A protein has these predicted regions:
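N-terminal membrane topogenic signal
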Residues: 1-6
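Membrane-interface coil-to-helix junctions
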Residues: 11-102, 109, 121-145
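Membrane-helix interface segments
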Residues: 111-117
């Protein structure tokens, strides 16, 4: 019962906190907008040639392209989470997964499932996460989660 209740609560909190997202509004994440510009020549080259470029001029006057975007053949976590996050999309999914990840970690440490809900909520709703979601540091959130 606790797992279903915890996941449902995390889902409801995420949906409630980012309610404007579900009305069609978009959070203008600055770093995501910058990434799209830096990534455009990489995507264009990948589409035209079918290969990943080794260099890009789209950031800092030129740098290795793998630092911005690279297509690895097997990205199990990204593919698994990607399917789930399509239900809510970013930013609500980032908040949801941060709470779920903390709750699962607490369970592994032997914390009572009901008790673990409170610190998981606190972790997901911490100021730091909400600030970096707004800034568009999505990969940083995935790394922390």
């Amino acid at each position: 019962m606790a797992p279903a209740a915890a996941l449902l609560l995390f889902l409801v909190v995420s949906i409630f906190y980012f309610a404007p997202q579900f009305r069609g509004e978009v959070l203008p994440q600055h770093d995501v907008l910058q990434y799209r510009g830096m990534n455009s020549d990489i995507e264009r080259t990948r589409t035209q040639t079918g290969e990943d470029p080794q260099w890009t001029g789209g950031m800092f006057g030129g740098m290795p392209a793998y630092l911005i975007n690279v297509a690895y053949p097997a990205q199990l976590v990204k593919q698994s989470v990607g399917r789930i996050s399509k239900i809510m999309d970013i930013p609500a999914s980032l908040l949801f997964f941060s709470m779920v990840a903390m709750w699962l970690m607490l369970l592994m440490f032997g914390v009572n499932p009901w008790v673990g809900i409170v610190p998981a909520l606190a972790y997901g709703l911490s100021t730091y996460f909400l600030l970096i979601i707004g800034a568009g540091h999505n990969t940083k959130i995935w790394a922390v989660v």
